């Protein structure tokens, strides 16, 4: 394949300005992640007094040292619900994809160092997303749990949808994907069913507590008086009730047992041998990705400058470039994995939509994964665009994206507006994974445009009623609307709302995409031995 010849002036003022802005954006979200870590660390004395490890210490013992670990949705729920100061982001869950005894797994740990690991609406949403990732990518699930259960302040938002988590667990087991849970502390009410639906359960002696109704509720409901240990302690569940398969002496021992369980599973042995991969690094350093995207989002740039820094050897086979240059399609390899790319150089034209739809079908035909790089204001509007059939061709593109069965990866590197977000496989079109650069924006439209639209609509409404709208009121309406949409379109707002699986430093993009493509390739090759019911205890 031909190599892209970069035209980026890495010594120019624009590059320096772009780089500075991107570095500030990266530092901003890293600082927020550190605040969450610092908040959890404040609980260390309490955990040490109880003879327990902090959640991240448990996770560190669980994962293979030195192996890659991809944390997911670290800033989910940032400043939402009870997270007033931004130190409780993460949805009460630390989660990601990493290796345990050489097996790639989906791992999750209750962040009991913050609010006892109670489940918020964000925490539930994150849990459901993690389960979706496990099912789509055939990843064993290992959970380290210690949670006070649902945050009752949000019971109405959690209760009904919470059942999906249990249903997903049953389906994961029925698919033939193992689930291992270590109980480090309390896991009551709904949390108890999370354990019961796991295939392997490890309980920590003297710490694990599992029951449907705790001592206070039990006394209120039935008059029975029992201690939490008598009601649902680790020994009861391991020796009498049979809910647990293994009894651990402490946190570290529980994690050790989880590693041994995963290690004894013939998970990797069931995977057909795959050819060894080799690749060449891009001709241009990934460090330069910091300066590719203009600090001013209104300035255009060529998405191929990003491709040149993530593709093996910077090689890219451009598809129908002469037909439409604003929607870029073509073939490349990332760390040896072939994939088809769709990127934006501005709005999606009718021709670009038709081109992309055709390219997606070709990738589906050849079983080639798809990568979407977002930087679009949406579909081209206007009378000429309508005459050219933008609705017809745009619908065709969305139809192709929605029905493509090959793995789809999405990386938002700039703007992602309107139906362009849908056509480029945004969250609602179910990409296998979706990540965003910290400079990116996602919204139905720009704030300024939204403000002007509401102003015009309000003026016309008053005119129909024979009235004249107050100019000051219109100014305020336009300003407030623009500010609201702008604040809700930032990368931070999007990741807090779980519109993506996390923010990524542009310099890590190539490594991230290579890792994700490898996960997808392994999932496509892996056979599963499922059943119609899952594994139940008798």
Where on the chain are the PLM-derived regions?
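Ligand-binding clefts of soluble mixed alpha/beta catalytic domains
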Residues: 1-538
């Amino acid at each position: 394949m031909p190599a892209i010849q970069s035209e980026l002036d890495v010594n120019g003022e624009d590059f320096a300005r772009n780089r500075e802005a991107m570095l500030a954006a990266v530092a901003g979200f890293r600082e927020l992640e550190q605040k969450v870590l610092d908040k959890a660390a404040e609980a260390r004395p309490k955990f040490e007094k109880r003879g327990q490890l902090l959640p991240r210490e448990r996770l560190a013992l669980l994962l293979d040292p030195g192996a890659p670990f991809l944390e997911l949705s670290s800033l989910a729920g940032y400043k939402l619900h009870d997270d007033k100061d931004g130190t409780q982001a993460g949805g009460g869950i630390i989660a990601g994809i990493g290796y345990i005894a050489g097996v790639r797994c989906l791992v999750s740990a209750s962040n009991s160092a913050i609010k006892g690991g109670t489940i918020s609406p964000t925490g539930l949403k994150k849990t459901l997303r993690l389960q979706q990732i496990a099912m789509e990518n055939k990843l064993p699930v290992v959970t380290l749990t210690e949670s006070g259960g649902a945050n009752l302040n949000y019971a109405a938002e959690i209760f009904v949808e919470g059942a999906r988590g249990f249903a997903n667990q049953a389906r994961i087991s029925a698919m033939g994907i193992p689930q291992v849970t270590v109980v480090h502390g309390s896991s009551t009410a709904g949390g108890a069913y999370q354990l019961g639906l796991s295939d392997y359960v490890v309980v920590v002696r003297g710490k694990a507590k599992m029951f449907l109704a705790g001592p206070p509720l039990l006394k209120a409901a039935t008059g029975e008086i029992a201690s939490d240990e008598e009601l649902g302690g680790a020994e009861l569940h391991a020796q009498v009730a049979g809910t647990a398969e293994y009894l651990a002496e402490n946190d570290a021992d529980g994690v050790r047992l989880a590693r041994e369980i995963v290690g004894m599973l013939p998970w990797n042995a069931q995977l057909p041998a795959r050819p060894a991969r080799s690749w060449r690094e891009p001709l241009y350093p990934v460090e330069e990705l910091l300066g590719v995207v203009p600090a001013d989002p209104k300035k255009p740039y060529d998405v191929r400058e990003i491709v040149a820094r993530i593709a093996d050897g910077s090689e890219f086979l451009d598809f129908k470039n002469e037909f439409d240059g604003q929607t870029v399609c073509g073939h490349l390899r990332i760390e040896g994995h072939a994939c088809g790319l769709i990127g934006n150089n501005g709005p999606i034209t009718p021709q670009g939509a038709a081109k992309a739809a055709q390219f997606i079908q070709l990738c589906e035909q050849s079983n080639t994964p798809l990568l979407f790089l977002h930087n679009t204001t949406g579909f081209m509007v206007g009378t000429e665009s309508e005459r050219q059939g933008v609705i017809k061709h745009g619908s065709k593109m969305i139809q192709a994206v929605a029905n493509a069965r090959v793995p789809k990866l999405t990386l938002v590197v700039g703007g992602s507006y309107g139906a362009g977000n849908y056509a480029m496989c945004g969250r609602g079109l179910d990409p296998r994974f979706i990540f965003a650069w910290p400079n990116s924006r996602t919204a139905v439209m720009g704030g300024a445009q939204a403000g002007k639209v509401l102003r015009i609509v309000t003026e016309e409404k008053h005119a129909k009623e024979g009235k004249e709208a107050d100019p000051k009121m219109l100014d305020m309406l336009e300003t407030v609307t623009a500010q609201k949409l702008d604040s809700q379109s930032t990368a931070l707002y999007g990741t807090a709302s779980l519109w993506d699986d996390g923010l990524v430093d542009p310099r890590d993009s190539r490594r991230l995409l290579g890792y994700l493509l490898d996960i997808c390739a392994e999932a496509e090759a892996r056979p599963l031995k499922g059943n119609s019911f899952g594994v139940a205890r008798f």
